[in-house]
């Protein structure tokens, strides 16, 4: 494709992204406007670069659904499998198509089976798994350009969300303080999901910075800007889980790298110093508020919830519930003490889909490590460590939050590739 067409596509999708960023309406756009936007978004990339559709969809969808305003991207996960399936038609022209990992197929069948039996309907978590399966067909594991493009789009996603947050910080505080507001945009109203989504872009930026094949000025600048701006936004978001997940993921990545000890010490010292500076600045009102709320239960509220839910799971129900769980959102109502959010994907999946479901999820997380080569193993483990730590304080997979499924797809893309020529 000529440079003129490439520049035209770049300008076109920049305008589409800008149209999302500047939205400030608190009422959802009409269905026709949403349909027109989605087709305008999907058709050009599918016609010219279908292999880049997964990265584009995950990035733009994450920005659109993590906005404080309503945007053109639907919050209902039922639409995304249809969009992904539509794009596969364009892949027929290409001989490069991948088979979805069997673990994803098996896990999605289990989820569908349990949800139909327990809830008599298909739930959003299955739609997200189905979208992940369909998007995995697009991957060409031998294409270096596809992996680099995925990294770039995750960086763009983090920068866009951070910019929206930093320029609308007061709007977020108003939404967060209204417990009864009923905000549909859960990612925006919950600083934990918002922070972890931005953290994905930071991890991707580090991949970009550590890759010898992407060492030109543009990639360096994009990576540095993503790390600096996104970390500032994450501190302001005051998500303790997101900050801890990012810190440990980065620490492992630096610690296991092949760079000199001197460089490791310098990098870690800079990260610690930068974080401490932000934590002691005057822009952490929300973090101070959230920390002060922990004094009521000594900071052990989540551990109490996990213990209560696990006791209820193992001491009630039938053998079917023990093996296959209570279905989507079953963990929320498990026990006799009312509605409680779990704040842990492992506990939630155990209660929702039983020991079988939890076992499949654990193998799904191990699968990228199993298939990767030695040169990519450090980066794959670091990315998985970040994702696993996010799952320890949130419920991204059991709740069907598509951005986290997209990040897992990115990890698969890295794991199945040949040597990426990383400095690590």
Question: Which sequence ranges carry the predicted segments?
Answer:
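N-terminal signal-anchor transmembrane segment
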Residues: 2-90, 113-115, 387
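Alpha-helical transmembrane segments of multi-pass inner-membrane proteins
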Residues: 109-113, 148-175, 189-256, 363
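Hydrophobic transmembrane alpha-helices and their immediate junctions
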Residues: 100, 247, 255, 263-264, ...
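Transmembrane alpha-helical segments and their membrane-water interfaces
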Residues: 41-46, 83-98, 106-164, 254, ...
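A membrane-periplasm/extracellular boundary helix in multi-pass inner-membrane enzymes
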Residues: 162-169, 232, 257-294, 313-315
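Transmembrane alpha-helices of multi-pass inner-membrane enzymes
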Residues: 14-20, 380-390, 397-424
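Long extracytoplasmic/lumenal interhelical loops at the membrane interface
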Residues: 293-353
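Flexible juxtamembrane loops connecting transmembrane helices in multi-pass membrane enzymes
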Residues: 178-187, 271-308, 333
